[in-house]
Structures are given as C-alpha cells and as structure tokens.
Amino acid sequence: MVVVGAGPAGLCAALRLNQLGHRVLLVERSRSWPRPQIGEALTPGVRNIIDLLDANNALETVPILAGKPTRLRWTSEAIETVAHDGAVVDRAAFDAALVRLAQARGVAVLRPASLVRVDGRPGSWRVQIATSEGLLQVDATAVLDAQGRQSRREPQRLRAPRLSTLWAEIPASARGPGADRATRVDALPDGWMWGAALPSGRYRIMFTFDPSMRGDAPAREPETLLRRACARSALFEEMAGLPWCNAPSMCASTPYIDALAWQEGRVKLGDAAFALDPISSSGVEKAMRFSLQAVIALNTWCRASNAMEQALARRFYESRLVESAARHFAWSAGYYRQAWCGESPFWRGRSTPTLTSGLAPDDTLAARVADLTLALQAEWAQIAVVRPPSGDSAPRLPMHDLIRLARDAEIVVVPCATGDRVIAHPALQHPNLDRPVAFWDGVALVPLLGALTRAALPVELIGSLGGSMEPASARRLLEWLRSKRIVEPAAFGANACPTS
C-alpha cells in the first residue's frame, strides 16, 4: 500500500493498515520536518482514534493546551464565556510523533518525495516516486491520496461558497504575562475571527472571509486586512496593533467534496476527499475518522473474493463520505444562520447548504457529480426531517402497557464495518433515525426486534431479551425505541411487522 501525505489522515491510514497486516510505504513531500501546520484544534473524539491506533505512549510528550474557556460573540453582540472541551496541540510535534511511531512499527517512510505518476490497473499499480536520489518505481496494491488541499483546481469537486483564511501569531511577550489564554470566536459582518493560545505561548489569530466579496485586494494587502479585522472586532481589538512573529499568511479554506474520491484501488483521504468549513474546528478528527473508515473499505476491497464484496466496500466508503460531508455542511449552515449579523451577504450566502461545480453538463465527469449531488440532497432531506432531542427527560416506560414496533419501521440491508471488514448487515430504518442502525450498545439490533413484531408488555420483553443483554440494557433499549417513536402503544393482538 502506498499512502501519499503524512498529515493526520495519511498517518492514521498508514498506522491502521499496518495493524491489519499490510505492507505500507508513506510518501511525504515536505523538505522541512517537522512541518508547521495551522490545524491544531483537537476535538474530544480524537482520543478514541488514538486509543484504536495504540498511539497514546507515542504522543505523551507532544505539547498540548487544554481546559481553556471560549469567549464567544456569535448569536448576539453580547460576549459570552463558555466551557470548551477541546484542546490545542503542537501540530508539528503531533505529526512527527506519529511518523516516528509508524516507522517503529515497520512502515517505510520516504521524505522528501512526491508522487509522479501511477500506471497499471486496480490491484496492480506501478507507482513512480521522485526522491532526492532520483525516480523510484514501486509496485502497489492500492494508492491512498492524503495530500490535503491542492493548489490546482479540481473540476470534479462540489464546492461551497468561497472562503479564504488569513492568520498570524502574536509572541507571548507582546501580550504580557497576565494575558488570558481563552479561545476567541467573533462574528463580523464580512467574515469571522478565531483566536487561540498555542502550547508554545504564542497566540494565533485568524480571519476567514470571502475574497470575491472584497474590493481591497486582500491577497496584496494581507497585513492591512487582518489588522483592520482585529480593529473591528469586540474580541480582538486589543490585538490590532500588537507585533506579529511573522508576516500574515493566507490560504484557501473553501469547503468541498470530491466526486472521484473513490476509484478502484485508489482512494482519497482527509482534505483530499472532502474539506470542512474551518468554523467547525474539527478537521483533524474528521480527517482521522474518515481515514479509518476508508481503510476498512480498502481492506475489504483488497481481500474480497468476488466483485460483489468489492462493490460493497465501495458503497460503504461512498456512503460514509456523503454522510460525513452532508452532516458537516448542514451543521455549518445552521451555525452560520445563528450569527448576529446574519442579514449581511456573507452570512446569507452560507445559511443553507449550497454546493456547485464548474463542470459543463456534457462533461464526462458530470454524471459522477450529479450522482453525488443527489446523494447529498437526500442526506440533507433526512437530516431536516429528523427531530433533534428536546433535552427533556423522556416519559418513563409504561411496563404494563402493550407496545409494538411502529408501522413505519423497516428492516434494510446496509454495508457495515464489523472488525476489519465491510459486510452486508440488516439494520433498522425509521423516519426518526438519521441513518439505519445495525448495532445498539455493541449488539446486533435487528434480531432483538423480533419480539416487537406483535404487541407485548415491556416487562415481558425485558425478560425475553435477557439472553442477549442485561435487564438494565434491555430496558434502556426499549426506552430508546420509545423516545424515537419506533415503538408505539398497541391494542391487544395488534401486529406490526416491519417490511424489508
């Protein structure tokens, strides 16, 4: 396996493929190492991924800053302080530690090196790699592209409205010893600002905006633009005149999804597959989690005994890609709608999920892009109809009232990751679920529903489920089904068999 790119997505894939017994070559183009990065925010879900990769010891010495509050001006012009359960990590040290771990476990690493071309056919690729010592030819079963955002324009990408991000760092000495280290997020009429203390003691400030809406040539005047944004901000005004460690940097930050993320034997990971809006601050976790899903799909594809199993692997990969991207785009749009300055053009243009491509209707890629668009729209429609939890406690389960499976519950077969493979697995589908559910609390769900196809008392159902789970778990399952309206009151003798 050849993995191209040693960011969180590529490193996660290389380590997981190694765990599954594959020989892995990791190719990284950066000449300087550890390389500086701006994606330092780690959301709590990263911990489970690190546990799965058995990488806790390797990351023990990586500088991290956690437990700092967030000062926020978003839904109104009033500033509020909220708890923050994420962390900020030294990304250069984080990536370097995972590279050392991969090498220690037998992953071959080429750096600096770059992918030149790929010839051959799926499952039998001839990969040409440029190194400091010349061209290298490598035979590979599969190629995983984790190179992140590319400067070239990819026509097969569906893009959200354009975004760019400017950033700079303030030295600790400039802010003084008593300066707070809180994260700051501020909505402005023409964009939003984010700031966070780094483990090094520096403070990073970022301004995200739409360059197409500006007439002040931001690419030519980045310092002026960033200082003016600080001056207009209630949370960053005090930083507008402070010295910076270096001149501001600027990068593209437009969210997108790639319609060609899966090709037989060649898959994309992380930002190469889909890029999140930076407002989420969850790019590292999403990149690593999707890499794990992609590895399971690719492992299944490589070890499949027939074309049906390979097709199932692809279906799993693409469904997870669409689900992850659609949920993020929908969440981002909802968050943009909450901004106190939401009537300005910048915010209105991002208040609903909107993706476009630059393809002509007769382009050869148009069909793939159209299929992806329909899949995303279907996912958005499902997200829209599923009601979020109200936050109120659900009524107690009536133990001596008959219940049954709701008539609009269905049993469907979906691609599901079990262990290190993708299999076709029965799952429960219902309008109040945002996706079919195959497992509940680690137990296959559909076999547990058989007793609910006819009217029954919860107290009896808890007893009948005792062979599969503890009584307390059985009760929680019934309460969850009732909270989702997947079970309903039933008259004696009523029947409600789900359809398949």
What are these regions (language model features)?
Residues 1-9:
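Beta1/beta-strand and adjacent pyrophosphate-binding region of the FAD-binding site
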Residues 18-38:
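Glycine-rich FAD pyrophosphate-binding loop
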Residues 20, 101-240:
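Predominantly flavin-linked oxidoreductase catalytic cores and closely associated redox partners
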Residues 47, 51-97:
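A conserved beta-strand/loop capping segment in the N-terminal third of enzymes
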Residues 215-303, 308-333, 339-341:
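FAD/FMN-dependent oxidoreductases across multiple families
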Residues 299-394:
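C-terminal helical "tail/cap" subdomain of flavin- and related membrane-associated enzymes
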Residues 367-451, 475, 479, 488-500:
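Acidic, low-complexity/disordered tracts enriched in E/D and polar residues
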Residues 449-460:
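Short capping segments at the starts of secondary-structure elements
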